[in-house]
Amino acid sequence: MMRVKVKKPILVAGLGISFLLWLGESLHEQAIAMGEWGVLSLMAVGTGVWWWQKKQPQKPAYKTLSPLTITEVNQAISEGKKILKIVKQEDSNYNLVELETQWKNLPQKLNNQSVSWGIISNSNTDKNSLKQLLEKEKIADNFNYLESEDDENVKQKLDLIVFLINTDLTESQWQMIQKCHQNHQRVLISLNQSEQYNTEEQEIILQEIKQRVKTIIQSDDVIGINSKQKIIKVRQYKEDKSYQEWNETQPPNILALITKLDSILSQEREKLILGKVWREAQKIKQQAKVILNKIRRDRAVPMMEKYQWIAAAAAFANPVSSLDLLATAAINAQMIVDLSSIYQQKFTLSQGQTIAATIGKLMIKLGLVELSTHAISSLLKSNAITYVAGGATQGISAAYLTRVAGLSLVEYFQEQEINPNQNQSLDIEKLSTKIKQVFEQTKRTEILQGFVKQTIPQLS
């Protein structure tokens, strides 16, 4: 068989170690030549690199999920019903017929034995070849094959995914596999034999993939296959050192994958169905939450705007900084109480005051107060028509910061789990992130110009 020379991981590792040994010896000789100050400089640089690496954000540890239980699936169904009920309570005119019908059908789907599968691959040629081979083996008759491509909605419907690759996993592919795992989708990784690698190299890559994914995918779920016919050149040597050479056809080989699919069909169908119903329940829950958030936001924004105009008037009437801050804090506290009521958090006035003080400190710490005041002052001075003497800058700044606080709280509340029977404590870190995001979205000159023009009439 003709062999193609490629860089092997073992060879690369060996060369790397040799290079490091040479580099270490060279640095040692140079360090002696540089003397004490040179060594101290190297130590300083090394310390700086170590400190910089410590400062870099660490990737969050990946959470491995336990297999779904019927109790967890029923809980997901129940949560969907709960949110649909809240939507009807808050807006009885909203049309929920389609979502309610989908929700009512979920318990019946637990008894439905139909499961869906699909192949995800960067190569359409490899994907189609494998699909055709599986169809010939009648394996596909037991599944509903879905052409996923890049359609996320279709991917969500897949109970079993054959992840077809022809080389090592990329980071984006690994992230996609993790996402499938989080969605309780069954994943098989099939390494398709490539002409780029010989058999030995293919096996090395296969073992590396198994090692990388072992936290969420079992070793026997990473399978080497050959989905396409290959022509191999064979050379046979004789005793007189002459040789004969001919081509042999190597047929496709997907037996290991077929065996695994048969095993899943006979032993894991119930798990696949639990995953399917759980995902559908989550989708209904998410869609209902989007509707509920829209209903609540439509009520929250006018209320927030009322308080931003009150804050503007109070700051305009009291341009002294200390009075301005006290008035704005008191107004924000009441706004927080009212917004929390809309989102079923129901903070007391005392809690509202504490949160308002926290938001004020966050804004000062992030530099938002100074930045917004400077930007608004510049806009006012650049336009003689809109410029108003006295406390205009403070009035508009107070309104703007009240709006940022209100929008940040709305965004924060919308991401919280919906539980009307339990008040949730405020996550300051998440709220701080929301404040920064809202400020970034609203600080653009054209947005601030529009806000200034909108606020000026409120001060007259």
Where do the PLM segments sit?
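Conserved G1/Walker A P-loop phosphate-binding module
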Residues: 2-150, 407
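Charge-biased C-terminal accessory regions appended to nucleic-acid-, cytoskeletal NTPase
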Residues: 371, 380-460
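C-terminal-of-GTPase-core extension/linker across diverse P-loop GTPases
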Residues: 74-120, 243-311
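A structural-propensity feature for long, helix-poor, extended segments
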Residues: 351, 355-383
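Transmembrane alpha-helical segments and their cytosolic interface motifs
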Residues: 4-14, 292-331, 357-366
